[in-house]
């Protein structure tokens, strides 16, 4: 939980020379996507339209990850996590409530991948510092990385796609999704406590609060806080999300360039994620034009009202757990009528809250597993899969139910 070398810690992101299986998947998708265009399986005009659509999304993804990485390097997450433990005054239930709120807020504001990649190591280290069970804090991060990702367009890439399709600004989008988000959070909180925190609490029900983490560079720490607030203010003011994240990242990059330029490396940019997303869009669009759309349209059906919303959300959740939530969203979105907002938002719930039953259903879950393995943490697998499947079903149904009540 401490910085090293007298300055901010170096952002944790694997270099290209250390290839990870996800690197190979990203490159394979990019090559496959380029091959689809080169061979004519995907017409160039369609590919150009797709790339034009996702360019603002790629700008957001690239800059928000840089913002999150440098925010972590400045010690913001470490400081906040230890302060949560201090504020809880040794109370296990109080720590639970504060950790749930912290993970949910991180997901809502800085997106689910930030929670999975950057908050997970902090929570794991906090558990070691407190000498408590690691599993409750680990599961809190991955569950809320997924189920807290409904409220704002920036919380999840699928949200950005949906908001762009229906033409909603962030506040209007939040006006639709705030009740479904509350429902998903309520179910998550109850299941987290019952299956994980209640069972693994300390024998005395209390723990010894740690000392507050001191950032290595207070100036960079304050700069990171200002950059995050600037990002949130830009979103609330209605600025394009890519521009808001780029401006905030630029401010923090300037701070690091002036004080610790050695921290800035090309590996800060999430090359793997950008390549993965670009290739995935092209490949899914190609498969859709060659038969997938017909199958997905049959699964999603044409029903309206509650049956249609439940079927769209269920199809999204099913396909997400079979493959992954991003291609699942793209495949179902392609067969929904342009003006069918209710089923689109139900699909969004299914592909955001539903991808928990299996580890590969969400990129955030894969990234979380990677961080847990790097820290030598093994979450009880059978218990995790069973409880995650329960959350996927109950959380999705609760969120879609509230959507139907308010739309």
Where are these regions (language model features)?
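Hydrophobic transmembrane alpha-helices of multi-pass small-molecule transporters
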Residues: 1-71, 179-181, 189-288, 387-407
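Hydrophobic alpha-helical transmembrane segments
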Residues: 27, 58-59, 93-101, 115, ...
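Short, amphipathic, aromatic/basic-enriched membrane-interface segments that mark the entry/exit
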Residues: 32, 82-92, 108-110, 209-220, ...
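Membrane-embedded alpha-helical segments and adjacent helix-loop junctions characteristic
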Residues: 44, 48-132, 271-341
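Helix-loop-helix module between adjacent transmembrane segments
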Residues: 68-69, 102-111, 144-151, 180-188, ...
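Re-entrant/interfacial helical elements at transmembrane boundaries that shape
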Residues: 80-81, 114-125, 138, 152-166, ...
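Membrane-core helix-loop-helix motifs of multi-pass transport proteins
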Residues: 130-199, 203-212, 344-347, 368-398
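Hydrophobic multi-pass inner-membrane translocation pores used for secretion
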Residues: 241, 306-309, 339-345, 358, ...
């Amino acid at each position: 939980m401490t910085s090293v070398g007298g300055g901010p810690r170096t952002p944790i992101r694997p270099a290209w020379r250390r290839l990870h299986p996800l690197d190979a998947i990203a490159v394979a998708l990019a090559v496959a996507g380029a091959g689809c265009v080169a061979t004519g399986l995907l017409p160039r005009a369609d590919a150009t339209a797709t790339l034009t659509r996702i360019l603002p999304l790629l700008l957001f993804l690239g800059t928000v990850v840089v913002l999150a990485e440098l925010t972590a390097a400045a010690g913001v997450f470490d400081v906040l996590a230890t302060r949560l433990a201090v504020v809880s005054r040794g109370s296990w239930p109080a720590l639970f409530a504060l950790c749930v709120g912290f993970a949910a807020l991180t997901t809502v504001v800085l997106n689910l991948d930030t929670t999975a990649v950057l908050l997970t190591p902090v929570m794991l280290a906090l558990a070691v510092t407190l000498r408590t069970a690691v599993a409750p804090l680990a599961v809190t991060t991955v569950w809320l990385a997924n189920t807290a990702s409904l409220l704002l367009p920036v919380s999840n890439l699928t949200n950005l796609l949906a908001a762009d399709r229906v033409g909603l600004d962030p506040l209007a989008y939040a006006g639709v999704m705030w009740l479904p988000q509350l429902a998903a959070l309520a179910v998550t909180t109850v299941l987290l406590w019952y299956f994980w925190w209640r069972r693994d609490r300390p024998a005395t029900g209390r723990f010894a609060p740690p000392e507050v983490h001191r950032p290595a560079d207070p100036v960079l720490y304050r700069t990171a806080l200002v950059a995050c607030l600037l990002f949130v203010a830009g979103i609330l003011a209605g600025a394009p999300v890519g521009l808001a994240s780029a401006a905030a990242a630029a401010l923090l990059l300037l701070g690091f360039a002036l004080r610790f330029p050695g921290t800035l490396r090309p590996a800060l940019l999430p090359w793997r994620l950008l390549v993965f997303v670009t290739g995935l869009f092209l490949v899914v669009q190609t498969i859709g034009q060659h038969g997938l759309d017909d199958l997905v349209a049959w699964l999603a059906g044409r029903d309206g009202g509650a049956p249609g919303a439940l079927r769209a959300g269920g199809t999204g959740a099913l396909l997400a757990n079979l493959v992954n939530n991003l291609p699942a969203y793209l495949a179902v979105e392609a067969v929904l009528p342009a003006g069918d907002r209710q089923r689109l938002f139900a699909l969004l719930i299914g592909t955001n809250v539903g991808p928990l039953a299996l580890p590969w259903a969400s990129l955030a879950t894969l990234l979380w597993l990677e961080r847990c393995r790097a820290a030598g943490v093994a979450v009880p697998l059978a218990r995790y899969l069973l409880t995650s499947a329960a959350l996927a079903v109950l959380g999705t149904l609760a969120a879609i139910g509230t959507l139907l009540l308010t739309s």
